[in-house]
Amino acid sequence: MNELFLKIINMSISASWLILAVLILRLVLKKAPKWVNVLLWGIVAVRLICPLSFESALSLIPSSETIPLDIEMAAKPTIDSGVPAINSVVNPVLSSFAPPQHVLTSANPLQIWIPILNIIWLIGVGALLLYTAVSYWRLCRKVDTAVRYKGNIFQSENVSSPFVLGIIKPRIYLPFNMNGQDLEHVVAHEQAHIRRKDHWWKPLGFLLLTIHWFNPLMWLAYVLLCRDIELACDEKVIKELGNEQRADYMQALVACSVNRRMIAACPLAFGEVGVKERVKSVMNYKKPAFWVIIIAVIICVGVAACFLTNPKQDRYTLRIVVPAGSQEEFVYTEEEVSTVRNSIKIWSGDGLGDTEVLLFPVNKTAETGYTATYLTHGMSVEFDAENDTWFKIGVNMQNPTNEDIIVYVEVENV
């Protein structure tokens, strides 16, 4: 469970770089259709959902794994954010958590703190899920006496503002006191939401927010997603109704802007938000030029290429677990590597001092192994290696403590 928690933190950090890019692009693409903003938030969702990503030279994500999944077991815990300024601030703090070298049996405090943070995260997730369930139940009770107006449109005396409720079979709920002209425009707006599948995207956004609730940028992204969805829907309705009905549509928006607290509080209901901004957007709406749409789409494709991929690595960090109570012997990496340049270059990584290092071909006997070479911290050792052969890296270590020790080697040309 701790590894899952750290994986989610890493995914959230990677998505944060994308969120920052989207915040900037929302300002740059003011003249673009609002659905472009929604598409950009969709790219953020993909980054948050997919645990795996391809490597690309185009990637603008500084680091694919900021926090090592085994950081709590590391002799010297460090992060790799891909930004030296951040590393220089955070890593000295993390190093202070490491037990002194002369206290061999002391546990890494991160082994205590990470499970505690994991529990806090789970409590937060549970609280938001409970909040969603309770608010949805309260809203369902509020409309259980609603009367069918026509089709999937219902009216209720307990409703003061229109909204869409439901994911599989969405229903439109309206107050009884709406006049005919406002009702026509409001129904057009809510039906546009359903056609655009917005009643799917808002719950999905809130689900991702529930998982990544610890990230402040996720809260900002969710608020802006809801606003951008409304603005995109308004543009769609104005395009269908025509400019001559723009003033009447704005009047309907204003009429729906009161007493909507109950709707806004339910993540599974789709009510009207940001009415002032929406009225201003409707007043200033102009059909975007074709070239603006083309540029916006190209930018979205570029954003996906740069932020849905991980940075291409030319050096990898491999983990070696030194068992508790072990005598001096060679211990090997869990991962296997294969050369791409007829040689493998090795550096001493975190927790590993000067020692012997060995390149060992997998599925071969010990007699076919390479000769051990002394590895000095800060300097590299290079082994000639056959192509199409997989190797493990071994280091000569001992561990007299009662806890497993994790050390790292860095390899290149693999």
Mark where each language-model region is.
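Short helix/loop segments within enzyme catalytic domains
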Residues: 195-196, 220-277
